[in-house]
A protein has these predicted regions:
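Catalytic core of membrane glycerolipid acyltransferases/transacylases, capturing the structured
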Residues: 3, 7-10, 44-104, 131-140
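Non-catalytic C-terminal accessory region of glycerolipid acyltransferases
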Residues: 2, 40-42, 68, 91, ...
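Short hydrophobic/aromatic-rich motifs at helix boundaries and adjacent loops
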Residues: 8-11, 32-35, 60-63, 81-83, ...
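Short, hydrophobic/aromatic alpha-helical segments in well-folded domains
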Residues: 37, 61, 76, 88, ...
Length: 200
């Protein structure tokens, strides 16, 4: 329990440090590994969906723009009820060039970006439990039936955008590696539910 609370406190402290951290320092503290995985798609003129979980300090992943300057980074987020804290959070997340996108606007903006020919990486975090109206997809996880969010798969199939998985790994206190893995280059070729199972 002590390690958990220490990690939680570290995560909050690291989040507020993002207010003033320099570009060089955040690139040292959050190293992007296998960036050639999404880069190959960008060279083909294709946008990418990046999927990750709430693990480590995912907020540091917004520095990806420092590694891939010619691509628009669009992290999906759920607005916070407190407007002041919401604006502050968005400001931190956009410090290095990311364009945070409210969850409710996701599909509309992604469709518009695709129609306009913008090359983007749209970031999804997806390990939360679905609300009651979204309990459509179930799978076995840790030997029990588990409801899983399937919005990422639905959007990926609709837009047929390649999907990569980002594994955020804590190397030591305050230092992370965000490693990219290729999940699927052609989501429409998969059976329904297959892509969701891939990233669980």
């Amino acid at each position: 329990a002590r390690k958990y609370y220490r990690h939680l406190c570290d995560t909050f402290a690291e989040f507020y440090k993002l207010w003033h951290i320099t570009e060089d320092e955040i690139k040292r503290r959050c190293v992007m590994v296998n960036v050639d995985v999404p880069h190959r798609y960008f060279e083909q003129g294709r946008s990418v969906i990046a999927f990750s979980g709430h693990y480590g300090n995912w907020e540091m992943m917004y520095s990806y723009k420092l590694w891939e300057k010619n691509v628009e980074l669009v992290p999906i987020y759920k607005p916070i009820h407190n407007k002041i804290f919401d604006r502050m959070t968005c400001k931190i997340r956009s410090r290095f060039g990311a364009t945070p996108l409210a969850k409710a606007d996701t599909l509309r903006v992604m469709l518009r970006n695709q129609q306009e020919g913008k090359i983007t990486m749209t970031g999804f975090i997806g390990d939360q439990t679905p609300n009651r109206r979204s309990l459509h997809f179930w799978t076995r996880f840790l030997n029990q039936d588990t409801a899983v969010l399937e919005g990422t798969e639905r959007i990926a199939r609709k837009l047929n955008q390649p999907v990569v998985f980002v594994n955020m790994r804590k190397v030591k206190r305050g230092h992370y590696h965000a490693e990219f893995y290729d999940l699927c280059s052609d989501p429409q070729s998969l059976e329904p539910g297959e892509l969701t199972r891939m990233h669980i």
